[in-house]
């Protein structure tokens, strides 16, 4: 019990005070503006950079000093005159600064933990999203069951505020957070709609990503705690950690829930072969043990979401499937375990018998249908996968057109080169290659046959065939047999920090 008290005291020591005064500092908005100039490719342009200036910020801070109307309740936001004439611009600027401020204590916590563990340099080297696939190849081939779980989001925004309140202790700070959230949804509603999530994520993507990541991090911290302490964690200690905010109000309910499902006082089991992977809004839970243990973890997840986050999750929405019979999607790939059966004849003295050997291999396949649908939406082909020209690029020079297609082809080839079957990847490259030729022919007002005859098809298409070979030749010796073998095998590039937008198109 003493160990868990130390854990809770350490968590409470991370609480940060006095974040609200930082909103009155000009350099905070300068950081937000600098971030917008160097905006990540994940985020869309919110379209107010041309209206942002130091003069606007100074006037805004002056109004914030003169009118202390930020410290209000969400229900009074309609009566608040603080926003002035340009409510959208003022709200946008302050929310961007708010997103910078709210990240400060957690960035300090992350950097300190990395420095203490002396893994800062290795952390930088392991940021590649491809680094997860070698792990899956090593581990998943020995597992038997997998559960593909969609992480539910809180049905009410107050839950997010309450979770964050445990880590940051600044009342005006949370009044302002409620004000921002109230501007984008109906606070009195019991359900947070997907329409609101889409609107909020586009208006302030930095703050939205922070709130979402913090919610996921909070639930995963509890899951990791349960996982590491599962061998000796009793129900009483678990309930103390589980209900950090409203423990006494919910303890009786928790006991009824858990004792209803289990006929003995709850003791966590030791499962050394469970693996957890999260990607976007989904997580994958895989184990070598029987489905009984997977069902245990399934109920733990459901009770965790319901009792701690007040999120209702249907048990039937979490399916447990044999890994050899179920394929799942991860990082733009389709993954499944293929069983290779072979029969070996063995002889012992005068007796001869056959032994069946089953070897599991992890197949990582390019999702050809979603990619063709994405290429069709981008006007590179039709829905059947037949290449078409892209007239909107016809105003560019021939070099720019070829360079654009080559860049897309190189990125897709670079990302999907870890596929176990390259046939689908070659089809995507063929679509882009022929679409490039049709675009050039459209620009020169000629047919494809006449354009290739005039310009020379071998020189034009050579770059599409050789660009990946040139990349590999920089890493491995230029040997034809070596390069051919590499083209057939999986190659995971550890410099890929994001997946292409075509991967996520639906």
UniProtKB/Swiss-Prot annotation:
It is found in: Plastid, Chloroplast. It comes from Lathyrus sativus. The keyword Signal does not apply. Belongs to the intron maturase 2 family. MatK subfamily. Disulfide bonds: none annotated. InterPro entries: Domain_X, Maturase_MatK, Maturase_MatK_N. This is Maturase K. It holds the Pfam family Intron_maturas2. Usually encoded in the trnK tRNA gene intron. Probably assists in splicing its own and other chloroplast group II introns. GO terms for molecular function: RNA binding. Keywords: Chloroplast, mRNA processing, Plastid, RNA-binding, tRNA processing. One of its GO terms (cellular component) is chloroplast.
């Amino acid at each position: 019990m003493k160990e868990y008290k130390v854990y809770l005291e350490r968590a409470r020591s991370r609480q940060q005070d006095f974040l609200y005064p930082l909103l009155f500092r000009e350099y905070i908005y300068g950081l937000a503006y600098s971030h917008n100039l160097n905006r990540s490719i994940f985020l869309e342009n919110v379209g107010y950079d041309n209206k942002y200036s130091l003069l606007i910020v100074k006037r805004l801070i002056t109004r914030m000093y003169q009118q202390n109307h930020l410290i209000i309740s969400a229900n009074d936001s309609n009566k608040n005159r603080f926003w002035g004439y340009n409510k959208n611009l003022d709200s946008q600027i302050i929310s961007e600064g708010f997103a910078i401020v709210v990240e400060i204590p957690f960035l300090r916590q992350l950097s300190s933990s990395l420095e203490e563990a002396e893994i800062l340099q290795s952390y930088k080297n392991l940021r590649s999203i491809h680094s997860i696939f070698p792990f899956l190849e090593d581990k998943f081939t020995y597992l038997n069951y997998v559960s593909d779980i969609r992480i539910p989001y809180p049905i009410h925004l107050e839950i997010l505020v309450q979770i964050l309140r445990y880590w940051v202790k600044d009342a005006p700070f949370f009044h302002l957070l409620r004000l921002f959230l109230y501007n984008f949804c109906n606070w009195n509603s019991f359900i947070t709609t997907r329409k609101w999530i889409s609107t909020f994520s586009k208006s302030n993507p930095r703050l939205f990503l922070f709130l979402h990541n913090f919610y996921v991090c909070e639930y995963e911290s509890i899951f990791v705690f349960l996982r590491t302490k599962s061998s000796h964690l009793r129900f009483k200690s678990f309930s103390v950690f589980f209900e950090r905010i409203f423990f006494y109000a919910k303890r009786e309910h928790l006991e009824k829930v858990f004792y209803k499902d289990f006929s003995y006082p709850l003791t966590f089991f030791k499962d050394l072969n469970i693996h957890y992977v999260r990607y976007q809004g989904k997580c994958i839970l895989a184990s070598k043990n029987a489905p009984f243990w997977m069902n245990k973890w399934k109920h733990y997840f459901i009770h965790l979401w319901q009792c701690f986050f007040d999120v209702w999750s249907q048990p039937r929405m979490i399916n447990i499937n044999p890994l050899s019979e179920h394929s799942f999607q991860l990082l733009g790939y389709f993954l499944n375990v293929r069983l290779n059966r072979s029969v070996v004849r063995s002889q012992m003295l005068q007796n001869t018998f056959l032994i069946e050997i089953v070897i599991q291999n992890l197949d990582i396949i390019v999702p050809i249908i979603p990619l063709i649908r994405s290429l069709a939406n981008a006007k590179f082909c039709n829905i059947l996968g037949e290449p078409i020209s892209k007239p909107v690029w016809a105003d560019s020079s021939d070099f720019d057109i070829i360079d654009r297609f080559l860049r897309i082809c190189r990125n897709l080839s670079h990302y999907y080169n870890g596929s176990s079957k390259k046939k689908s990847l070659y089809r995507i490259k063929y679509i882009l290659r022929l679409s490039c030729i049709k675009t050039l022919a459209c620009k020169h007002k000629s047919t494809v046959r006449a354009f290739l005859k005039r310009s020379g098809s071998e020189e034009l298409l050579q770059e599409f065939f050789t660009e990946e070979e040139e990349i590999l030749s920089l890493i491995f010796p230029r040997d034809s047999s070596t390069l051919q073998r590499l083209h057939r095998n999986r190659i995971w590039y550890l410099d890929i920090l994001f997946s292409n937008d075509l991967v996520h198109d639906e």
